[in-house]
Amino acid sequence: MVTPPPDVPSTSTRSMARDLQENPNRQPGEPRVSEPYHNSIVERIRHIFRTAVSSNRCRTEYQNIDLDCAYITDRIIAIGYPATGIEANFRNSKVQTQQFLTRRHGKGNVKVFNLRGGYYYDADNFDGNVICFDMTDHHPPSLELMAPFCREAKEWLEADDKHVIAVHCKAGKGRTGVMICALLIYINFYPSPRQILDYYSIIRTKNNKGVTIPSQRRYIYYYHKLRERELNYLPLRMQLIGVYVERPPKTWGGGSKIKVEVGNGSTILFKPDPLIISKSNHQRERATWLNNCDTPNEFDTGEQKYHGFVSKRAYCFMVPEDAPVFVEGDVRIDIREIGFLKKFSDGKIGHVWFNTMFACDGGLNGGHFEYVDKTQPYIGDDTSIGRKNGMRRNETPMRKIDPETGNEFESPWQIVNPPGLEKHITEEQAMENYTNYGMIPPRYTISKILHEKHEKGIVKDDYNDRKLPMGDKSYTESGKSGDIRGVGGPFEIPYKAEEHVLTFPVYEMDRALKSKDLNNGMKLHVVLRCVDTRDSKMMEKSEVFGNLAFHNESTRRLQALTQMNPKWRPEPCAFGSKGAEMHYPPSVRYSSNDGKYNGACSENLVSDFFEHRNIAVLNRYCRYFYKQRSTSRSRYPRKFRYCPLIKKHFYIPADTDDVDENGQPFFHSPEHYIKEQEKIDAEKAAKGIENTGPSTSGSSAPGTIKKTEASQSDKVKPATEDELPPARLPDNVRRFPVVGVDFENPEEESCEHKTVESIAGFEPLEHLFHESYHPNTAGNMLRQDYHTDSEVKIAEQEAKAFVDQLLNGQGVLQEFMKQFKVPSDNSFADYVTGQAEVFKAQIALLEQSEDFQRVQANAEEVDLEHTLGEAFERFGHVVEESNGSSKNPKALKTREQMVKETGKDTQKTRNHVLLHLEANHRVQIERRETCPELHPEDKIPRIAHFSENSFSDSNFDQAIYL
């Protein structure tokens, strides 16, 4: 054992923590510990090395302790790894880190998040408040770890206003920045994820180089999209078709010699032959390049269909049709150079990480992902958070308070104040936590840093600076057309409707972004396809690939476990564990009372959302299921998903709802699931409906909404009023007056005009099924029947399909009359046909109106506000007309009949009918008053007005229509 130098304290961090006592006679405004930290001569020498290693990362000094550390907010700290041994000579020492946190925040007020996978230390060094996340360096963060990190951090911060968190990885910049940015997204610190990234980068580093790796930024944007869609992460399985490279780089020898590797996690799945272009051919290739881009904002799904080509000139690396490759979850694509002496280095030109869940809109329940750096460039002289020409609407400037003098300072820049800052911590609480102990609240230092760096001009849009200007075409000559196979080119790559194309320009490629030798027009196209679950052979092959990647990853993790100090090895999971708790070795470990990591997550987090989901107990998938609050709005994707390109359903084979006699998950053969899906599609085909959306329990009739039983994991536990966030109203939805329940004050009921977020009384809209509504409102009342976004979508799509067919005259009238048991009476048929003609005339008048351009610019608004609105108005008229006819006795069901058949009271249905009739009635009156030429009274019969008091059993029974 080496004896430390005499001037280095030989005491442990834990003993120093016990010796560190707050001054019992401290007065307000005085520090907790009156004596500053004593630095030995050796520590002063070490400080020179530490400062050099930290380089451009910001440092913080307090009572003679100078650390690689930055306050991102008053309560969130990014800090370097608390090292021991040799590493402590050039990184933060564990002793100084513990002293720093205790002196500034007191004992028991700091929770440390360790993101350096495989590195553990005694949790008692930090009051037993440590959580470890297994994150690999130089890899994108695991999406499944972002949500549990944010939940644990928020639980800790909400427990006490004095609580803070300290987050570190190795350097305290990359992985630390990703997770802190995810947390800021989680608490709605700024509305845009790019604002959050810029904010973090400016504060954490001196040169605005915080989270710079494009793949890390992409995964932050992934997490923002998950939050936006209110989804938990669950990977999607896809087939890899090929990889295309535009403008291959010049390599050693003057030509271009590159190879491509595709990996799933750490497993290489596709390694084709290299592409070799001679020097002369590469010179001819470069001569065809124009300094233009022929697609706006590079390339996305809409532009694929518009132009009809993935690329006009690209080199291909195609997967052989007889040897398909399948990927799931995190995928890495490397582009490497081959040539002289490259065997002594990796020869990497660039690489890309992406996740398959975001490759198909079906993986996001209809959402669409785009790289935010591309869609939100800086405008004019402004940055994402800096304004030089005044604040924009709904923005407030950050206060310009000099942290040293307390006076206001001058700056030509205005910084957007984070909208979520005051909810995160109020200014009064910040003053109490810091000023009361003789410290300056970090928010004032942060404001000064943000203004100064904007003044220095170091806040730049590096990503969009490498975009090519718009032009008519990108190449003087297109590639050759024909059969595209193997490796070669250049080819003109046609776009195929069933293929998903992910395009990564040079500014979205890791390492390539920093290379000035690469052409700004270089792109990497990755072509994927959703797995057709009707092809049993394909399904079996895809299972092999998925199991292989999981096996290799598990082997790697277990090998790392054998090299770990036995003191830190995790204990086996408890019997009966579900979800991530049964994943071994665990990816998240919580400190326990013995200073080790055998603890549990916060007691406020529960497993209700996957308690009855069998996929959560499988070794391959359990790692994605973490506990969350019972009031959380995030849900896991359902078993069946829908691909909008191939217009087919696909499913997670492991996500079965069946169990054997022992209660264990039971999995059928692929043929069983294929038949199950074919049955769904056959039922839809029999009804004449296009297969337009996800379904979980068969199909409904045209224009009707079928109630479905939701699984236990999808049921919503109503939140208390204190936990409810503000209700959101999409921009394309108008507010209609309605009589009855006040959606904003659910306890009040009156006959005054209230506002309901609905469209002509048609309730299956996402915002009506948002848990932000009070459980007593009609929104949550309807949620009892439509539990998930997918069920909402299929209801909307079926109704819209019915309307489209009615307007197009495709013989749906007979199907409509048959489904609703309407007698084939000529007068009734004439009436419905006449209503369709009236609606067509209304559309013609609409096109001539002044607002037509505005309406046409928003197709979604046309569909929702006019098509569905008018259709359901007509549907209401048909109900009233047929109710008055004695020729239709089978069209009605009495309340007694419904109770007898279902065994349930019809109060819920009464409320549904009440909401429909009231909304339809009010909308008709509103439209008739505002636009009488479109709604003549003689052509639109008035629907009887119902109120809750006058809604008797008799007229209620008349309103129930099959």
From Swiss-Prot:
GO CC terms, sorted: axon; cell projection; cytoplasmic side of plasma membrane; cytosol; dendrite; neuronal cell body; nucleus; perikaryon
Organism superkingdom: Eukaryota
Phosphatase tensin-type domain segment(s): 58-230
Location of the protein in the cell: Perikaryon; Cell membrane; Cell projection, Axon; Cell projection, Dendrite
Annotated EC: 3.1.3.16, 3.1.3.48, 3.1.3.67
Enzyme category, top tier: hydrolase
Positions of the UniProt region annotated as Disordered: 1-37, 382-416, 689-731
Keyword DNA repair among record annotations: no
Subunit text: Interacts (via C-terminus) with vab-1 (via kinase domain); the interaction is independent of vab-1 kinase activity. Interacts with arr-1 and mpz-1; the interaction may inhibit daf-18. Interacts (via C-terminus) with daf-2 (via kinase domain).
Function: Acts as a dual-specificity protein phosphatase, dephosphorylating tyrosine-, serine- and threonine-phosphorylated proteins. Also acts as a lipid phosphatase, removing the phosphate in the D3 position of the inositol ring from phosphatidylinositol 3,4,5-trisphosphate. By dephosphorylating PtdIns(3,4,5)P3 antagonizes PtdIns(3,4,5)P3 production by age-1/PI3K and thus, negatively regulates daf-2-mediated processes including dauer formation, longevity, fat metabolism, chemotaxis towards salt, thermotolerance and axon guidance.
Protein name (record): Phosphatidylinositol 3,4,5-trisphosphate 3-phosphatase and dual-specificity protein phosphatase daf-18
